[in-house]
Amino acid sequence: MTRSEALFEQAKKTIPGGVNSPVRAFNGVGGSPLFIEKADGAYIYDADGKAYIDYVGSWGPMILGHNHPKIREAVLAAVHNGLSFGAPTELEVQMAEKVIAMVPSIEQVRMVSSGTEATMSAIRLARGFTNRDKILKFEGCYHGHADCLLVKAGSGALTLGQPSSPGIPEDFAKHTLTAVYNDLDSVRSLFEQYPTEISCIIIEPVAGNMNCIPPIPGFLEGLRAMCDEFGALLIIDEVMTGFRVSRSGAQGHYGVTPDLTTLGKVIGGGMPVGAFGGRKEVMQFIAPTGPVYQAGTLSGNPIAMSAGLAQMEALCEEGLYEALSAKTKRIAEGFKAAADKHGIPMAINYVGGMFGFFFTEQEQITRFDQVTKCNIEHFRTFYHGMLDEGVYLAPSAYEAGFLSMAHGEEELRLTLEAADRVLGRMKAAM
């Protein structure tokens, strides 16, 4: 038994399922999860001392790589001044100014402590501002675990939502409408059915929780137009894509202006953090300037602000995003080339520092229903093969992969050579 396996058995005695977030349990791929002891650059090291090239990056935040010296130094300097004050700090002001400078649609921003808190608060604000109850989300898009967001259409995209997790009252679920990602007709049908009741659309501009699905041309623009037509707000959930797809997020990359934006992951530099911001007219509706209540004991935590500021400043380096995109393209297209070489059907998607691959004969994946038809057994086999080769991918066929600036030529080469060997063994076993 490895030390990771022993720790997992020990953890299951005191922690539900042995983990503090379900995907970490490896249920999607089988086997026992790795327990991580440390990380540096492009590598993580498990409890048994084995190194892995990491394409999870703490699920997105580590865009500069693990244990980046500028972030580490900023955190250590902040720690000397105290861990939390429960009062305003200059760091919060600096972070707000940095976010606003990088994302043109954001005129004011409120810091919180998680992505879930950000989306939950943005939706409450949208409901309060519009005085409407219903929200519209998309099948396969994840926006955190707030009750109103853990909802999926029960018998099709145009039906009232049904709870997708026990513990969510149907009275909550009925206000959440679910449309089909990359399908404007499904959105218009809902607006025509509830023309004055929908407060907002919330969307992952690049869906990263059904693997990696970019928007088709015109989709985000169509959502913006429909929100304007029916008086709803457009919330772009950039918890995952913010400052990862481009310096101004996915909204900057695709040229779409939302009313509200949610952020997280990258803006914390690896610390727990979230934020929501947007038009001043809307943001002024939040307490203490407006009637919509939102608060948080650790919001704007000085350690998180210090880490986030250090990372955000580093991301302003000229040419960084072009280099990151080139690395991502090389990995995604390299996986596809290796699969083609061995006669294993595969489709790929990638944008900025995000990528996805699908074991499927479908040429292009643009919707959630297509993702569910992909070969999960092939993914599991590939996953464990790559893990044995020292490459750590997301342990689920429904999660995106992430590159960092710490992934260099050697890491990319080693990863693609490993993929070639694993896919070759898979073909030989078929």
UniProtKB/Swiss-Prot annotation:
Subunit annotation: Homodimer.
Protein name: Glutamate-1-semialdehyde 2,1-aminomutase
Repeat as UniProt keyword: no
Annotated pathway: Porphyrin-containing compound metabolism; protoporphyrin-IX biosynthesis; 5-aminolevulinate from L-glutamyl-tRNA(Glu): step 2/2
Major localization class: cytoplasm
Coiled-coil ranges from the UniProt annotation: none
Tagged with keyword Isomerase: yes
UniProt organism field: Shewanella sp. (strain ANA-3)
Names of required cofactors: pyridoxal 5'-phosphate
